[in-house]
């Protein structure tokens, strides 16, 4: 999945907004997204390093969106 597909699928204006959208829809207590985002911020390029992202507790976590995000990261080689 590429950035355009991801953005078009969820009507997100840009990648930064998409990351923030994911975080707003994630339960921060699970911790795995926070770890992933921190990893992305240190390995994913200057656009991610400059973000100041703090996960917030939201009860409705959409696993499909989260999995799409992970797939995008893997496809984009953000992690490895």
Swiss-Prot record:
Self-associates. This is Protein P9. It comes from Lettuce infectious yellows virus (isolate United States/92) (LIYV). The lineage of its organism: Viruses, Riboviria, Orthornavirae, Kitrinoviricota, Alsuviricetes.
């Amino acid at each position: 999945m590429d950035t355009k597909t991801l953005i078009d699928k969820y009507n997100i204006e840009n990648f930064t907004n998409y990351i923030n959208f994911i975080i707003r829809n994630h339960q921060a207590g699970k911790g795995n997204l926070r770890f992933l985002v921190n990893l992305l911020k240190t390995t994913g390029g200057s656009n991610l390093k400059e973000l100041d992202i703090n996960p917030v507790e939201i009860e409705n976590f959409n696993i499909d969106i989260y999995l799409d995000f992970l797939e995008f990261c893997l496809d984009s080689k953000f992690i490895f």
